[in-house]
Amino acid sequence: MEQYEKEEKIGEGTYGVVYRARDKVTNETIALKKIRLEQEDEGVPSTAIREISLLKEMHHGNIVRLHDVIHSEKRIYLVFEYLDLDLKKFMDSCPEFAKNPTLIKSYLYQILRGVAYCHSHRVLHRDLKPQNLLIDRRTNALKLADFGLARAFGIPVRTFTHEVVTLWYRAPEILLGSRQYSTPVDMWSVGCIFAEMVNQKPLFPGDSEIDELFKIFRVLGTPNEQSWPGVSSLPDYKSAFPKWQAQDLATIVPTLDPAGLDLLSKMLRYEPNKRITARQALEHEYFKDLEMVQ
């Protein structure tokens, strides 16, 4: 740790405190994430160290770079490249963003590039949300933070400061208790983020797991064996769920053009293996005029 000098606390993430710090060797500003482990007394699990070490090999322009992993008996520090703006802060401070379909398209494309890269390396995120999409103010590059951390450390129900970890971007198969989920969970989150960029408000802002499910069902219809084969055998599925009819997405995201609505509907498919992949999404016609954008 001697190599890094903490300058100020910049946030409290899902896993612990985040500091802005300086690398004394290179004089570079970095983000230092202190991971608080659930079982404090047991020290750092070797599986977590292995998982995290793999993430150091991830190099992509749309992934926040993990420079270093420092671990002592009791805790882990992760050293990341430093970016001071995230998509949530950007949307909150810049309401006119919704009127810039070109920038929305560019950001969505970059999110998908980062997700496609991670999925091609068999790494899931599981907790994608606007707060962990970081923006470089100078270049408008968007980068995904915290990829792979869920597998190493699990996703707590509450952060270490007792804030509830958001459910707004969580895929229905996870909410219904599936243990067999895979890369489609991240594509669901991307769909929720896409709609939020366009509408300037969250698509499914549930405040509990059941409220989250019902907010989804009210828009997409309550799933059944016809719309989602196998749904009734998921652990937390109840035949007594209220039966809502699907709404037209065009009424939910009224300013999105037809190509965008088509892409969004493919991201928000109930059946995980029918959900569009990141690779497929990058080829979607919604992006056909992107060359002029970038």
Swiss-Prot record:
Record PROSITE patterns: PROTEIN_KINASE_ATP, PROTEIN_KINASE_DOM, PROTEIN_KINASE_ST
E.C. number: 2.7.11.22, 2.7.11.23
Induction: By submergence. Down-regulated by cytokinin.
Organism superkingdom: Eukaryota
List of residues that carry Phosphothreonine: T14, T161
PTM remark: Phosphorylated at Thr-161 by CDKD-1.
Catalytic center residues: D127 (proton acceptor)
Catalytic reaction list: L-seryl-[protein] + ATP = O-phospho-L-seryl-[protein] + ADP + H(+); L-threonyl-[protein] + ATP = O-phospho-L-threonyl-[protein] + ADP + H(+); [DNA-directed RNA polymerase] + ATP = phospho-[DNA-directed RNA polymerase] + ADP + H(+)
All copies of domain Protein kinase, residue ranges: 4-287
UniProt GO cellular component terms: cyclin-dependent protein kinase holoenzyme complex; cytoplasm; nucleus
Main enzyme class: transferase
A GO MF label: ATP binding
InterPro entries registered for this protein in UniProt: CDK, Kinase-like_dom_sf, Prot_kinase_dom, Protein_kinase_ATP_BS, Ser/Thr_kinase_AS
Protein's UniProt keywords contain Nucleotide-binding: yes
Residue(s) carrying Phosphotyrosine: Y15
Keywords, in A-Z order: ATP-binding, Kinase, Nucleotide-binding, Phosphoprotein, Serine/threonine-protein kinase, Transferase
Binding site for ATP: I10, G11, E12, G13, T14, Y15, G16, V17, V18, K33
Tissue specificity comment: Expressed in the dividing region of the root apex and in differentiated cells such as those in the sclerenchyma, pericycle and parenchyma of the central cylinder.
Similarity comment text for this entry: Belongs to the protein kinase superfamily. CMGC Ser/Thr protein kinase family. CDC2/CDKX subfamily.
Name of the protein in its database record: Cyclin-dependent kinase A-1
Organism: Oryza sativa subsp. japonica
Gene that produces this protein: CDKA-1
